[in-house]
Every structure is written in structure tokens, then in C-alpha cells.
Regions:
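A charge-rich, low-complexity, intrinsically flexible signal that marks solvent-exposed coils, linkers
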Residues: 2-54, 59-91
């Protein structure tokens, strides 16, 4: 019986990803980093590769935010992403 729940979560995640693209208010940078890191963790798993260096401040911030989620399951990342988008759309 776990399979339908997983499919439902995936559908909710995909709907949230579409809703995030259509928000009327631009989120602040901290919220954008949370959305990015949860999305990447949900879709790709733990961060890999070297941290961007030099003057790539945005790349470094994205890498760091994603790296903080190391070990989080895809399901937990999807759930957190959905909650973050819901919160954003309520504002």
C-alpha cells in the first residue's frame, strides 16, 4: 500500500514545483535557497562535486544550502518543498 502514497507525494511535489514558478510575489533569497536545496535533494539526492569557489557567490550559497540537507530522504525533501511553496503562496 505504500506505492500509492509515494505516487501522490510525487504528484504533489510536481504541482508545487509548477506553483512555485507562478508565485506573484518574488521570494527573498533565503526562501529561494530553501526551495532550491529541497528541490535538488528531492530530485538528485546528496550534493556531489566540488563547491564553487572564487567569485561565484551565488553558486557557493546554492551548494552550501544543498549540502546542509545531506542524508535527507527524497520523500522528506519533497514534503519540505511542498510546505515551503504552500507557505510562500499564503503570503
Amino acid at each position: 500500500m505504500a506505492a500509492p502514497k509515494k505516487v501522490d507525494l510525487k504528484a504533489q511535489f510536481e504541482a508545487a514545483a509548477e506553483a512555485a514558478k507562478k508565485t506573484k510575489k518574488k521570494p527573498d533569497n533565503a526562501t529561494l535557497l530553501k526551495l532550491y536545496s529541497y528541490y535538488k535533494q528531492a530530485t538528485e539526492g546528496d550534493v556531489t562535486g566540488a563547491r564553487p569557489g572564487g567569485f561565484d557567490f551565488v553558486g557557493g550559497a546554492k551548494y552550501d544550502a544543498w549540502a546542509k540537507l545531506k542524508g535527507m530522504s527524497a520523500d522528506d525533501a519533497m514534503t519540505n518543498y511542498i510546505k515551503q511553496v504552500d507557505r510562500l503562496n499564503r503570503e
